[in-house]
Each structure stands twice: as C-alpha cells, then as structure tokens.
UniProtKB/Swiss-Prot annotation:
GO molecular function, one term: anthranilate phosphoribosyltransferase activity
Protein's name according to its UniProt entry: Anthranilate phosphoribosyltransferase
Broadest EC class assigned to this enzyme: transferase
Binding residues annotated for Mg(2+) 2, in chain numbering: D223, E224
Reactions listed under catalytic activity: N-(5-phospho-beta-D-ribosyl)anthranilate + diphosphate = 5-phospho-alpha-D-ribose 1-diphosphate + anthranilate
Pathway field: Amino-acid biosynthesis; L-tryptophan biosynthesis; L-tryptophan from chorismate: step 2/5
Keywords: Amino-acid biosynthesis, Aromatic amino acid biosynthesis, Glycosyltransferase, Magnesium, Metal-binding, Transferase, Tryptophan biosynthesis
Required cofactor(s): Mg(2+)
Organism, as annotated: Vibrio vulnificus (strain YJ016)
Example of a GO biological process term: L-tryptophan biosynthetic process
Annotated binding of Mg(2+) 1, by residue: S91, E224
Bound cofactor: record note: Binds 2 magnesium ions per monomer.
Length: 332
C-alpha cells in the first residue's frame, strides 16, 4: 500500500489493479483516514484516469452485496449529481417513462448530496420502499420493468470513507463512482456527468468495465441531456466510442430556458412529477424527460430520436408511466 500511495505523491497514475487494491483497502476500512485523505487528494489534483476509476469501481462492486442479475438487456439512467442546478428529478422520472416504453431499468441511487431532492427523496415521497430486498427488487424489474437499488444497502463499505469525504468538503473520485457501481451490473447505461471534461474519460472507463452499450452526456452545464442548449455525447457501440453533439432540434423539441425545469424540495418535486406523469406537465418538463428517455431508447437499438421522444411524451400524457410508480409502491 505504501508503494501505491508514494506513487500518487509523485503524481504518477496508478494501474487499474493498483487502484482496485487501494479502494479495496478503503472499502474494508483498513486504510488510515489520514492516508485515505492524502490518496483521494493526490488523485483529485492529478486527475483520475479511466484505469483508476475502473479499478476503484471494480473494488466497490467486488465488495458489494450480491444482486441476482437479470440475463436480459437492462439499463441504468443516472447522473453524477453535483451540477449545482437543482432541476426536477429528470433521470428518476425518465426511468419510469422508459419502463412504460418497454425498456427494463434497474436504477441505482442515493440520498441527495447537493440538490434539494435526490432520487431516493422523491421515491420515498411516493411510498416506494427503498429497503426492498434484492430478490423483490429483481422481481420488480422483471414484472414492472423498473426498480430502484438504494446504494447504502449494497455498498456498506463506503461508510468508511464518509468521515474523510465530509471533512474534505470537495469533490473526489467518489462523486463519479456512484453511477458506475450499480450492484445489478446493467449492460446498458445512460450516465450524465457534471463536467464536460469527464465525458470521454467516463466513456473509456465504461468500456473497460465491459458495458455493452452506453452513453455519457453533459448538457450545457447539466448532468443530463439538455433542452436549453447542446449536449455532448460519448456513446459506446460495438466496443468503440463515438463522440457527437445533440441539440433539442435533433429530438424534435423546442429549446427552453433552464429556469423552466427548476425543481424544489421533495414535496414540490412530487407534485411536479405527478403532474408530468398524468398528462399535466408543461412542454418544457415533458421535453426534458423525453429527450433523456429517447437517448436511452437509442441504446436499446431504437435509433430514431424524434420518434423515441414522441413515444416518451405520449406515455407521460397517457398516465401509463404513473401506473408504474403506483405498482412499484405496492410491490413490497
């Protein structure tokens, strides 16, 4: 371990194996907190490489509680958070809409770090059981098409890093690991990142982790596909990363100001999402969710973004996605 940490002091990058070893020690609670802070700081200042991120993610997955992985194609749709814009819960809402469009989604999430209402805060407000067993969660993905894995239930070892992270009060590699350590191990993923500098490295990380098809996005300041500006995309297809830019027009929607999709506290967000999923959403809110669902549908082989967007809007207006929220609340 000393050799690994000394390497970081010299601002040298770790191999994937070394990073996995370092994070295995952290997750088991075997690394002194002062050394942990030093290692996290050194990684942050140097800039984490895809090898280092993949190694850390593999360590966390290896130490996670097991989950009965489906043998069919299924996805996660998730953002790193931390973009500082406090929009409505787009990826959580999109998970239900995607399921109503026929996709399978096992969404990994946590309590809110920086926004007023994280995905679990919202699900809580709908009466969805965040402590559902792995078996019940898996059966929800099978039968309803969507379920939610609450991070602390599967990644108990992350608690060893919490005091250090809270004291450091700055972003570390842990801020980008969440979306990469879904214990269900989906083979398809749409992941939003808080900075465009992360788009390519995270796509390279996903490639190293064996993701079948995925897209990493940053939308003009948001960790989602944007309707207020351009979205930078790095898409993994057939083992190759394709980078491109999408505009609202590519989805057949109008451009809307960021203000139009502002969120609030969990109760306000619950009201907004209920409206959205029962045909009473605003054009901007519907578009914001639909463009994210549309890109996720592309990852399942439905290539026409405009048709996908329209299908997602129709599903929201029909109330079909809201029925899935109710089903999941009754599931366990």
């Amino acid at each position: 371990m000393e050799a690994i940490i000394n390497k970081l002091y010299l601002q040298e990058s770790l191999t994937e194996q070394e990073s996995q070893q370092l994070f295995d020690t952290i997750i088991r609670g075997e690394l002194d907190p002062i050394l942990m802070a030093s290692a996290l700081t050194a990684l942050k200042i140097k800039g984490e490489t895809p090898d280092e991120i993949a190694g850390a993610a593999k360590a966390l997955l290896a130490n996670a509680q097991p989950f009965p992985r489906p043998d069919y194609d299924f996805a996660d749709i998730v953002g790193t958070g931390g973009d500082g814009h406090n929009t409505i819960n787009i990826s959580t809402t999109a998970a239900f809409v995607a399921a109503a469009c026929g996709l399978k989604v096992a969404k990994h999430g946590n309590r809110s770090v920086s926004s007023k209402s994280g995905s679990s805060d919202l699900l809580d407000s709908f009466g969805i059981n965040l402590a559902m067993s792995a078996e019940d969660t898996r059966s929800a993905v099978d039968s309803i098409g969507v379920a939610f894995l609450f991070a602390p239930q599967y990644h108990s070892g992350v608690k060893h890093a919490m005091p250090v992270r809270q004291t450091m009060k700055t972003r570390t590699i842990f801020n980008i690991l969440g979306p990469l350590i879904n214990p269900a191990r989906p083979n398809i993923e749409l992941m939003g990142v808080y900075s465009q500098e992360l788009v390519r490295p995270i796509a390279e990380t996903m490639l190293k982790m064996g993701m079948k098809r995925a897209a990493v996005v940053h939308g003009s300041g948001l960790d989602e596909v944007a309707i207020h500006g351009d979205t930078l995309v790095a898409e993994i297809k057939d083992g190759v990363i394709h980078e491109y830019t999408l505009t609202p027009a590519d989805f057949g929607v109008n451009t809307h100001p960021l203000e139009a999709i502002k969120g609030g506290d969990p109760e306000e967000n619950k009201a907004i999402i209920t409206h959205l999923l029962t045909g009473k959403g605003t054009e901007a809110q519907l578009s914001a969710v639909a463009v994210n669902v549309a890109l996720l549908m592309r990852l399942f082989g439905h290539e026409d973004l405009k048709a996908n967007t329209q299908q997602a809007i129709d599903v929201m207006n029909s109330g079909k996605a809201y029925q899935l929220v109710e089903k999941l609340a009754q599931h366990a």
